[in-house]
From Swiss-Prot:
InterPro entries: Hyethyz_kinase (IPR000417), Ribokinase-like (IPR029056)
Organism (species): Streptococcus agalactiae serotype III (strain NEM316)
Essential cofactor(s): Mg(2+)
Family from the record: Belongs to the Thz kinase family.
Stated role: Catalyzes the phosphorylation of the hydroxyl group of 4-methyl-5-beta-hydroxyethylthiazole (THZ).
Binding, substrate: 38, 186
SUPFAM superfamilies assigned: Ribokinase-like (SSF53613)
Full protein name: Hydroxyethylthiazole kinase
Record Pfam families: HK
Known EC number: 2.7.1.50
Sorted UniProt keywords: ATP-binding, Kinase, Magnesium, Metal-binding, Nucleotide-binding, Thiamine biosynthesis, Transferase
């Protein structure tokens, strides 16, 4: 349902993301059926966000200048009622990253918070090991998701060996995916963009259902890619993953 709607809408998804993953993110969105724009010029965004379906803010390659860009872009998105997805990359790795992430969450309207266990744990004051975008082990992703949902009053997606989605106090746990996905730089960052495209093309009447389908589409694409690339390595997996995203249909996830 939501995947077909995305393909029909072809949502313009503005991605202010990190320098490492821009190409992969754009190609992933195109494969899925969305329309990416990677603009980082405020004068440009003033017009783009009047017609955009969603905005992704990914703080991976953070600078003081980019912090100001995030703030200005979110202000424009909020003014135009464009949903904003925040990916607080490595929020627990430094005080500066934590400060920026909390500023964006507390002072602007965020539509979805997406991160790994360590990142989201840091935002809610839980003591967890963090080693950048890869994060550390978090024992209970479900409780972290619920706490973040309550603290920030925003839908939350927490990724790990089990993914947790929390919306208005309701939680859903998902276990699809491939162990090869974390071995390709940008798979987590692309996920943030994919979630933005999904909610940006929906009517927002049931975020839990929409996010569940988005996560399942993404993770099942990883499973398909793993089978295709078996024995070939992570380079082949990356290509197979984009192929799987481009060929994904709703009936392929019906029993997942």
């Amino acid at each position: 349902m939501y995947l077909e709607q995305l393909k029909e809408v072809n949502p313009l998804t503005i991605c202010i993301t990190n320098n490492v993953v821009k190409n992969f993110t754009a190609n992933g969105l195109l494969a899925l059926g969305a329309s990416p724009a990677m603009s980082e010029c405020i004068e440009d965004l003033e017009d783009l966000l009047k017609v955009a379906n969603a905005l992704l803010i990914n703080i991976g390659t953070l600078t003081k200048e980019s912090w100001q860009l995030y703030q200005e872009a979110i202000k424009i998105a909020n003014k135009n009622q464009v949903p904003v997805v925040l990916d607080p990359v490595a929020a627990g790795a430094s005080r500066f990253r934590l400060e920026v992430s909390l500023d964006l969450l507390k002072n602007y309207s965020i539509s979805l918070l997406r991160g790994n266990g360590s990142e989201i744990a840091a935002l809610v004051g839980e003591k967890q090991a963090s080693k950048g975008a890869d994060g550390g082990k978090v024992a209970d992703l479900e409780s972290i998701a619920v706490k973040a949902n309550q603290v920030f009053d925003v839908p939350v997606v927490v990724t790990g060996e089990t993914d947790a989605i929390a919306v208005r106090g309701e939680v859903r746990l998902l276990q699809n995916g491939s162990p090869l996905m974390p071995l390709v730089t940008g798979t987590g960052c692309l996920l943030g963009a994919v979630l933005a495209a999904f909610i940006g093309s929906s009517d927002r009447s049931d975020d839990l259902a929409c996010l569940t389908e988005a996560m399942t589409v993404y993770n099942v694409s990883g499973e398909i890619a793993e089978k295709v690339a078996k024995g070939k390595g992570v380079g082949s997996f990356q290509v197979a993953f984009l192929d799987a995203l481009s060929q994904m249909k709703s009936e392929m996830i019906m029993d997942k």
